Amino acid sequence: QNADEGQDLIAAHDDPLVHYFNVPKKSVWDDDAIAAEAASHWERVRPGYARDMSAVAYFFARKLARTIDCPIGIIDCYWGGTSVTCWMDKEALEATAEGQRYITRYREQGGDKPFDQWRQEEDAFWVEMNAWNAHVAQLKKDNPGISWPEINETVGPCPWHPPVGPGSPYRPGGLIETMTKRVVPATLTGILYYQGEDDTAK
């Protein structure tokens, strides 16, 4: 839906050769995650659907299906802004110096704190984050031409990042357990990998 022509495509596209499955974005395996998994299913690309499909995966699948004239099924398993370490199990991380460095940094930042403590910090973070977003939205509504420096001067810088902890989607070795392994062993012909942007500065 965020692609340049996304809204027009969502309203009009109808491709019987392309299906997609969205793995529920869950960083903790709890009752909510179990219910989300039970409700998830394959969808065919048709008008009004695929709003939540990865744009990269959508355009790739559409072109591939037309090129080889064969049905294409895309499993969307991603979480924007995450490190590659979120999608690697701890054994793989511990096997390299780079992986060990991520684990050490995570622990130094308080990643091993009790779950309840992390949950309280996470809830408090989102109260602050949502309030900041609401202030920004109001500023943009009142002054459509306002610049980001002016916004930051008025409401302060964005309070991102969320706290680290045992339920954080950004923790090393987390999403591979709560997302990737939930769709294994699916039979895959290929993989599109474009996670890991968070690692570019590290």
Regions found by a protein language model. Name each.
Residues 1-202:
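Cell-envelope and extracellular/periplasmic
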